[in-house]
Amino acid sequence: MTLTPQSIASGQQNAQIGTDLVLETDTMRVWHLRLAPGETIPPHRHDRPYFWTVLTDGKGVSRFDDGQVVPITYKIGDTKNFADLTPSTGFVHDLSNTGDSDLIFVTVEFNTEGKTS
C-alpha cells in the first residue's frame, strides 16, 4: 500500500524525523528513532542534508511520496548519507518496523543556513 495524498500532505508539514529530539543547535539536530515491532513513524519530510546510522539489526518498509514502497534489511552500523538534500529535492516517507525486535537509529540533520525547520 502506498502513501495517500492526505498522508503526503500531512507529512509535508511534519518535521519530526525521529521519536526523540536529543540535541538542537543553530546548525544541526540529533534525533533518536526507536520503533517497536509493528510500529510506524508517521509520514514526515526530509528537506535538508542528513544522515542516519542504525544501531540494531532489523527489517522495515518505507513508503515514499513518489509511490515507491521499499523493504529494507538493516545491519548494525548501516549508515546512509543525504548530503545534497534541499527543500526542492526533499521527500516525504514513513518507516514501519516489520521485524521482530526494536529498530533503533540515530539521525543527524544539518542546517547550512543556521535555522532548523
What residue spans do the PLM features occupy?
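A short glycine-rich, His/Asp/Glu-containing loop-to-beta-strand
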Residues: 15-42, 48-52, 105-108
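Residue-level recognition of short, solvent-exposed, well-ordered loop/turn junctions
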Residues: 36, 55, 75-78
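Histidine-centered active-site/metal-ligand motif
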Residues: 44-46, 92-93
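Short acidic-glycine-tyrosine-enriched beta hairpin
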Residues: 66-87
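Asparagine-centered strand-capping/turn motif at beta-strand->loop junctions
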Residues: 94-99
